[in-house]
């Protein structure tokens, strides 16, 4: 049993290497610096990143361990011939958190699948504090949840590789519904920070579902998302902004070049219903960007709910012990309400 006092070294010994590598994926393989000292505990990690709640990380990890003990949970998104042609695609994975609750398959029972993308400034994928705890809660509420590890920044421009990875993951799930025991008839995408940008792009026809000839997600569920690339990076000092823009889009880019990837500038009435949670005290991504996005969705007559707790910061993931706590269940309720279904959660006996 993992606790807040469990060390990184102990977690590594509990998890198989291929699962441990999914906790915080980056090209350095050091958990974006969090795992360089393996004597650190989850409580130590929270002390360094206060928004990363140790109890939430414990909840996600213990759920992952239980799932792994029951069977396979880690899947390659791309085929071997695709990874041979592009080795970076070998790092694109899905971690499955199967639904832990079930309806009784009554007339109005609908199975749903949620695909989550963690944040990390497109330089890492921070599943440990974000997608894994959220997926564990969604699974406890009857949602099959899969956490996507997508390609992150390197020397070459990154975009649109993450968008390709999300589309490939959705296609993989449609092709493997029976093998994974999931249903993609009703699916949604969600994400956190940069992963929120990725999920939000999935709802744009030109960047997401229509471009890749996929059914549209029924909902987009976002936590403190990066919605406008230029505005989000504009607050950074010039050298850092240039460095990140180069990593995302290549050298010599400017505001106009970011346009296709600015979610708030590319929505229309066909955008999926959207739930957003964003703390007002977020000092990394301005909450006002989410507010402006919500206003744009309302203008386009797209169903939208935005929650703006006063406190929570950036990176709260599931939101345990913050004013955002419970947002996962509220987001799932919102998703269900778009299809006018009875909202109920029934735990398996």
Residue map of PLM features:
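Alpha/beta-hydrolase superfamily serine-hydrolase fold, recognizing
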Residues: 1-349
């Amino acid at each position: 049993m993992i606790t807040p006092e469990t060390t990184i070294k102990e977690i590594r010994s509990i998890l198989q290497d291929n699962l441990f590598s999914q906790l915080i994926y980056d090209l350095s393989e050091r958990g974006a610096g969090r795992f360089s000292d393996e004597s650190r505990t989850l409580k130590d990690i929270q002390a360094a990143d206060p928004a990363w709640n140790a109890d939430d990380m414990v909840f996600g990890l213990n759920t992952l361990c239980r799932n792994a003990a029951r069977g396979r949970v880690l899947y390659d998104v791309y085929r071997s011939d695709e990874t041979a042609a592009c080795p970076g695609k070998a790092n694109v994975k899905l971690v499955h958190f199967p639904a832990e609750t079930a309806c009784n398959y009554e007339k109005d029972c609908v199975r749903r699948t949620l695909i989550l993308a963690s944040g990390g400034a497109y330089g890492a994928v921070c599943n440990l504090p974000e997608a894994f705890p959220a997926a564990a809660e969604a699974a406890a509420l009857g949602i099959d949840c899969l956490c996507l590890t997508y390609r992150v920044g390197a020397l070459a421009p990154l975009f649109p590789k993450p968008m390709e990875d999300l589309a490939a993951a959705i296609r993989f799930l449609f092709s493997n519904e029976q093998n994974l025991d999931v249903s993609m008839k009703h699916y949604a995408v969600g994400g956190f920070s940069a992963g929120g940008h990725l999920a939000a792009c999935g709802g744009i026809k030109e960047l997401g579902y229509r471009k890749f000839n996929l059914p549209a997600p029924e909902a987009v569920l976002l936590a403190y998302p990066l919605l406008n690339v230029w505005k989000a990076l504009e607050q950074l000092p010039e050298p850092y902004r240039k460095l990140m823009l180069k990593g995302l889009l290549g050298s010599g880019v400017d505001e106009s070049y970011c346009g296709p990837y600015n979610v708030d500038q590319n929505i229309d009435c066909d955008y999926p219903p959207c739930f957003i949670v964003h703390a007002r005290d977020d000092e990394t991504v301005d909450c006002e960007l989410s507010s402006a996005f919500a206003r744009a969705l309302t203008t386009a007559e797209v169903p939208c709910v935005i929650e703006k707790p006063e406190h929570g910061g950036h990176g709260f993931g599931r939101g345990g012990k913050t004013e955002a706590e419970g947002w996962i269940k509220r987001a799932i309720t919102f998703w269900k309400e778009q299809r006018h279904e009875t909202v109920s959660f029934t735990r398996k006996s």
